[in-house]
């Protein structure tokens, strides 16, 4: 058993198909679960050995896990997470970094890293995790998986250790869309009538080098138009993405400070300290969270409001000539704007393929800001986002890599439109 991936193996070595606790639509599908969920008889470690050692044994299983088991899923193992789920890299200095099965020279992505790698290796069909700032979407992109961040608040977070409750969601990853849809039907049972959008907005991030994503847009537009959708292209300015990233980073930091204040407010060292041993990068981020003020939070909230207004204006109504994420980060609609039907965004899940292993902290921090310029959009809006393994990053491929590394493309919609994203993806893959 690879301890970089698995914290508490259950029946990991058994054959597939022996069933879960119940007969149901997920019968015979192996389930692995991120080390943030309560599972009866196990401890929650949150990616930290000190927290694991001091954690109580759980008396109940989290409702999200229990729902999958009752639908027939076969729970196999608890999987590793980046420490406190506060990273998108898939690294953990305590337990090691799991190898990305699709790109061994590159990061696997986090923080739901163990679940992603287990599924990508074929050791499970369902990888349950969480997504706050991208922890389902990013490893899905890097490992070539399907991954869904559902609408915030749609699935119970009971029995989970939080990071930033305002943004935390349950999420899941699979190797195929059919399984992802099956899991969605179990975890999002209160399904309303699926409303397909009339418009698809193809977002092109400013500064994204010409390559696989842009080459996809032509054939994708033709395919969508053949299915009756109206396609529009819009640019995401660097200034707008920076505004979204910074707003999310500060609001998330304020939430994290409140989540962990019981021990963050104690001395870092000495007899009164309640701090666990932390990796240096995570410790530095937590210390930064402690510096945030009420005025910082208010300023970030104002920035987030501009992002939210733009998001809803884009998706809730079409505009003659379109609407652009302007250089100042505001949403500027043309005066002849006319409300019609809803839309869905298409965008790259990440700025490209996964970064290489061994990149410096400075390089990774700069990359994290670019990455969060994309992932923050769903987080700030409480919106669903579906990452699809439709691309490989040919331009990033190194001579020593056997194949081009994976790169995800996302569908992203208004809150509550999770089923619409899944239905649209099925239409495009048929």
Predicted regions and their residues:
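Short helix-loop capping/hinge segments that flank enzyme active sites or metal/cofactor-binding pockets
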Residues: 29-49, 250-305, 326-329, 333, ...
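General beta-strand structural signal in soluble alpha/beta enzymes
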Residues: 33, 75-80, 128-130, 233-234, ...
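Charged, often glycine-rich, active-site loop that binds/positions anionic groups
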Residues: 89-99, 243-259
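Gly/Ser-rich catalytic/binding loops embedded in alpha/beta enzyme cores
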Residues: 1-124, 321-327, 334
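Structural helix-boundary/capping segments
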Residues: 121, 126, 132-207, 383-430
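Short, hinge-like loop/turn segments at secondary-structure boundaries
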Residues: 93-96, 144-147, 250-251, 363-365
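Gly/Ser-rich, acidic/histidine-flanked active-site/gating loops
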Residues: 31, 185-254, 266
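Glycine-rich, small-residue loops and helix-cap segments
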Residues: 295-430
């Amino acid at each position: 058993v690879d301890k970089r991936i698995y914290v508490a193996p259950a029946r990991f070595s058994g054959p597939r198909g022996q069933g879960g606790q119940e007969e149901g639509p997920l019968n015979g599908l192996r389930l692995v679960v991120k080390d943030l969920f309560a599972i009866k008889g196990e401890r929650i470690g949150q990616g930290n050995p000190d927290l694991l050692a001091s954690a109580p044994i759980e008396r109940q299983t989290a409702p999200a896990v229990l729902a999958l088991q009752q639908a027939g899923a076969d729970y196999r193992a608890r999987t590793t997470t980046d420490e406190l789920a506060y990273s998108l890299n898939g690294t953990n200095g305590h337990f090691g970094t799991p190898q990305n099965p699709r790109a061994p020279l590159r990061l696997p992505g986090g923080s739901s890293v163990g679940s992603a790698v287990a599924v990508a290796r074929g050791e499970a069909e369902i990888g349950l995790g969480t997504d706050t700032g991208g922890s389902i979407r990013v490893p899905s992109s890097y490992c070539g998986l399907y991954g869904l961040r559902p609408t915030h608040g749609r699935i119970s977070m009971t029995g989970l250790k939080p990071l930033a409750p305002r943004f935390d969601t349950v999420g899941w990853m699979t190797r195929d869309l059919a399984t992802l849809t099956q899991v969605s039907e179990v975890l999002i049972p209160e399904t309303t009538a699926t409303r397909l959008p009339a418009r698809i907005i193809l977002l092109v991030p400013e500064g994204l080098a010409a390559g696989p994503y842009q080459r996809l847009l032509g054939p994708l537009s033709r395919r969508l138009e053949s299915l009756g959708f109206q396609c529009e292209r819009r640019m995401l300015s660097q200034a707008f993405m920076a505004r979204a990233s910074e707003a999310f980073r500060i609001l998330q930091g304020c939430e994290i400070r409140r989540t962990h204040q019981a021990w963050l407010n104690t001395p870092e060292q000495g007899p009164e300290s309640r701090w666990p041993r932390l990796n240096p990068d995570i410790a530095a981020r937590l210390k930064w969270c402690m510096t945030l003020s009420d005025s910082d939070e208010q300023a970030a909230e104002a920035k987030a409001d501009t992002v939210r207004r733009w998001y809803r204006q884009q998706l809730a109504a079409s505009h003659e000539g379109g609407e652009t994420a302007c250089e100042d980060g505001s949403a500027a609609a043309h005066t002849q704007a006319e409300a019609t039907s809803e839309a869905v965004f298409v965008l790259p899940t990440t700025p490209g393929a996964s970064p290489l292993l061994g990149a410096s902290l400075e390089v990774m921090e700069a990359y994290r800001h670019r990455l969060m310029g994309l992932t923050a959009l769903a987080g700030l809006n409480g919106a669903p986002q579906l990452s699809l393994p439709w691309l490989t990053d040919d331009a990033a491929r190194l001579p020593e890599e056997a194949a081009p590394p994976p790169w995800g493309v996302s569908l992203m919609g208004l809150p509550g439109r999770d089923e619409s994203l899944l239905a649209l993806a099925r239409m495009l893959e048929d």
